[in-house]
UniProtKB/Swiss-Prot annotation:
<keyword id="KW-0386">Hypusine biosynthesis</keyword>
<keyword id="KW-0520">NAD</keyword>
<feature type="binding site">
    <location>
        <begin position="318"/>
        <end position="320"/>
    </location>
    <ligand>
        <name>spermidine</name>
    </ligand>
</feature>
<dbReference type="GO" id="GO:0034038">
    <property type="term" value="F:deoxyhypusine synthase activity"/>
</dbReference>
<dbReference type="GO" id="GO:0005737">
    <property type="term" value="C:cytoplasm"/>
</dbReference>
<feature type="binding site">
    <location>
        <position position="287"/>
    </location>
    <ligand>
        <name>NAD(+)</name>
    </ligand>
</feature>
<feature type="binding site">
    <location>
        <position position="139"/>
    </location>
    <ligand>
        <name>NAD(+)</name>
    </ligand>
</feature>
<feature type="binding site">
    <location>
        <begin position="138"/>
        <end position="139"/>
    </location>
    <ligand>
        <name>spermidine</name>
    </ligand>
</feature>
<keyword id="KW-0808">Transferase</keyword>
<feature type="active site" description="Nucleophile">
    <location>
        <position position="333"/>
    </location>
</feature>
<feature type="binding site">
    <location>
        <position position="292"/>
    </location>
    <ligand>
        <name>spermidine</name>
    </ligand>
</feature>
<feature type="binding site">
    <location>
        <position position="245"/>
    </location>
    <ligand>
        <name>spermidine</name>
    </ligand>
</feature>
<feature type="binding site">
    <location>
        <begin position="133"/>
        <end position="135"/>
    </location>
    <ligand>
        <name>NAD(+)</name>
    </ligand>
</feature>
<feature type="binding site">
    <location>
        <begin position="346"/>
        <end position="347"/>
    </location>
    <ligand>
        <name>NAD(+)</name>
    </ligand>
</feature>
<feature type="binding site">
    <location>
        <begin position="312"/>
        <end position="313"/>
    </location>
    <ligand>
        <name>NAD(+)</name>
    </ligand>
</feature>
<dbReference type="InterPro" id="IPR002773">
    <property type="entry name" value="Deoxyhypusine_synthase"/>
</dbReference>
<protein>
    <recommendedName>
        <fullName>Deoxyhypusine synthase</fullName>
        <ecNumber>2.5.1.46</ecNumber>
    </recommendedName>
</protein>
Amino acid sequence: MEESMKQASVMENLRSVVFKESESLEGTCAKIRGYDFNNGIDYSQILKSMVSTGFQASNLGDAIETVNQMLDWRLSHEQVTEDCSQEEKNPTYRESIKCKIFLGFTSNLISSGVRDIIRYLVQHHMVDVIVTTTGGIEEDLIKCLADTFKGEFSLPGAELRSKGLNRIGNLLVPNDNYCKFEDWIIPIFDQMLEEQKAKNVLWTPSKLIMRLGKEINNESSYLYWAYKNDIPVFCPGLTDGSLGDMLYFHTFRNPGLIVDVVQDIRAINSEAVHANPRKTGMIILGGGLPKHHICNANMMRNGADYAVFINTAQEFDGSDSGARPDEAVSWGKIRGSAKSVKVHCDATIAFPLLVAETFAAKREQSAEPSS
């Protein structure tokens, strides 16, 4: 009898540990459900189902929702404050004020087919400020002069070098492409130097980039559309790439060209500081310089209101590339009240899907005739 009571006590203790009573999640958390293909193939609904799928699919779904919030926001959604200007009290004006979107990306994405998606966004003026690396400038221009090809990640470097082929992941860029780039760009540098001397033009990286977008005059180029739509493109590391090589070569041929980075740091910080009364949103593909430059500019206004990071970097080495949005909150680069998410995914996979369900979907909806 005593042994039986002991067994019952043990079982009761085990049950209390193993079957601990749960706090109800009904109404507070989304239920995990995937897409049901019995409903047919509906790509928009498949993307909408990501948010309830789990893991990085849910992060992608959250990113889609965050970008749509950026695109939907209007000043009219906010309460009128006592200290706002008369113009800001006007309902028509308030409805016209949209979120200011900063787009950042690394050069490899311009080497890839994501270039065409970025060109689409810039062509239709869907973003307001761009930050990229030098490769993100030169690769766009070079693709107007010659093609990039699909290769393999495993191709041996020594063999490729002997053939004059450069590998970017599983992409191949013939070395001849850079020769064509040199032939195209050096005369432009000559013209810029002449204008510097004759007209006292003080070039900055963003002014130089705008000039290159004008000179390339090619609708496949996102820089061309940035020039056409007056969207600033910032590149603080302008010398770190083939473009830097060309500037270096130009110093031997025709020395004296000056490019001032100080004007540009004032310009990009001003883009954030003077954004008010607009909210600001950040969409950053990859890490490094573009990620930090955009975040740091938004720190000047006490943080961005929306943030979407898409990259595969980890935070455990303390790198800015791998840092989650919450780390940026600690620096004041993202507001504590902001809607933010990081998608741990190759941007060549995630970004086209995100654009399809945000920017492109809204543009398509606006083009549909009203019934």
